């Protein structure tokens, strides 16, 4: 049986909030089987919890933001959520003493290290997957995203920015998902932004924690980071990272083929909602026989970083 997974022990880290620029303490705790991924703001009294849920995603302008019925929000969850998806962690309590998850270095890599440091433990309950049964597509102008059936989790993402530093040869990335592939090919890809946009955001009191230490920054002609890129196609890889985090808001790893063109947090969430709203388009599956598990979802015994 492919089993659910949680952490062996609690672990804590501090970082900076992307929008506030303030120090944030993040604590990850093990959770019982069938708990799911639960975000919790401990800076509020009483603390407010946000189960990872596609319908709780409201504000997707700059990041993925969960909002509850009272309008309380927690922001910038997508990179941590992607790390949880990458390592197949089903049950975890995520506590943060601020309105946002710390940005760390702008990628999912610090969260991968954190999760592996805590250790991963199998639980005595079957892991549920969402299997795509029929095509679902959403569009917004020339942007689109779709799921089709596939025995695994395949991602094909294309970006389209007219910029001298973003050539046509670095605008598409395709990956067959596995924990190893995610860690090595996707997790280190950092978020990116354009200098003119960042300056405007900071004038509005946003992105105050944004810097060359936690983002790739481009002016009108070039990349400003002295160390350059971690991959020549780091930008599209990061958009794939975002998508993996956004789609894990379902609370379950997905078995299907995901394709996207110029998609972002909003369209990723729109696709996920469209899938879940159509009972004919998906089903829950579990695997008693490990041999029957789709490629990439075999429980990894170890992950090489």
UniProtKB/Swiss-Prot annotation:
UniProt function note: Catalyzes the hydrolysis of UDP-3-O-myristoyl-N-acetylglucosamine to form UDP-3-O-myristoylglucosamine and acetate, the committed step in lipid A biosynthesis.
Entry protein name: UDP-3-O-acyl-N-acetylglucosamine deacetylase
What's a Pfam family in this record?
Answer: LpxC
- Alphabetical GO biological process terms: lipid A biosynthetic process
Which cysteines are disulphide-bonded? none
**What sort of enzyme, by top EC class, is this?**
hydrolase
Matching entries from NCBIfam families are given as:
lpxC (TIGR00325)
Q: Which residues bind Zn(2+)?
A: 79, 238, 242
What metabolic or biological pathway is this protein involved in? Glycolipid biosynthesis; lipid IV(A) biosynthesis; lipid IV(A) from (3R)-3-hydroxytetradecanoyl-[acyl-carrier-protein] and UDP-N-acetyl-alpha-D-glucosamine: step 2/6
Its cofactor is:
Zn(2+)
Similarity remark:
Belongs to the LpxC family.
Against InterPro entries, the record matches this protein to: Ribosomal_Su5_D2-typ_SF (IPR020568), UDP-acyl_GlcNac_deAcase (IPR004463), UDP-acyl_GlcNac_deAcase_C (IPR011334), UDP-acyl_N-AcGlcN_deAcase_N (IPR015870)
GO CC, any one term: membrane
Q: What is its EC number?
A: 3.5.1.108
Q: Which domain of life is it from?
A: Bacteria
**Where in the sequence is the active site?**
265
Which keywords label this protein?
Hydrolase, Lipid A biosynthesis, Lipid biosynthesis, Lipid metabolism, Metal-binding, Zinc
């Amino acid at each position: 049986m492919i089993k659910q997974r949680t952490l062996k022990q609690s672990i804590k880290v501090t970082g900076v909030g992307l929008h506030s620029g303030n120090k944030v303490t993040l604590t990850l705790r093990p959770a019982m089987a069938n708990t799911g991924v639960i975000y919790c703001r401990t800076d509020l009294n009483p603390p407010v919890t946000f189960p990872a849920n596609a319908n709780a995603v409201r504000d997707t302008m700059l990041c993925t933001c969960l909002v509850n019925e009272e309008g309380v929000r927690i922001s910038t969850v997508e990179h941590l959520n992607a790390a949880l998806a990458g390592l197949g962690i089903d049950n975890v309590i995520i506590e943060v003493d601020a309105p946002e998850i710390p940005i760390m270095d702008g990628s999912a890599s610090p969260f991968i290290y954190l999760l592996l440091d805590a250790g991963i433990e199998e639980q005595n309950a079957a892991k549920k997957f969402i299997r795509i049964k029929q095509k679902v597509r959403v569009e917004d102008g020339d942007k689109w995203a779709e799921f089709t059936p596939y025995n695994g989790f395949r991602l094909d993402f294309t970006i389209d920015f007219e910029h001298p530093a973003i050539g046509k040869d670095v605008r598409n990335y395709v990956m067959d998902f596995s924990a190893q592939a995610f860690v090595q090919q996707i997790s280190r890809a950092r978020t990116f932004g354009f200098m003119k946009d960042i300056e405007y955001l900071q004038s509005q009191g946003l992105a105050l924690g944004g810097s060359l230490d936690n983002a790739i920054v481009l002016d009108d002609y070039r990349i400003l980071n002295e160390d350059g890129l971690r991959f020549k196609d780091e930008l599209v890889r990061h958009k794939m990272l975002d998508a993996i985090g956004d789609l894990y808001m379902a609370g379950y790893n997905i078995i299907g083929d995901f394709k996207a063109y110029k998609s972002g947090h909003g369209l990723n969430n729109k696709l996920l909602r469209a899938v879940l709203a159509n009972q004919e388009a998906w089903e829950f599956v579990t695997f008693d026989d490990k041999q029957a598990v789709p490629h990439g979802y075999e429980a990894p015994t170890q992950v090489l970083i």
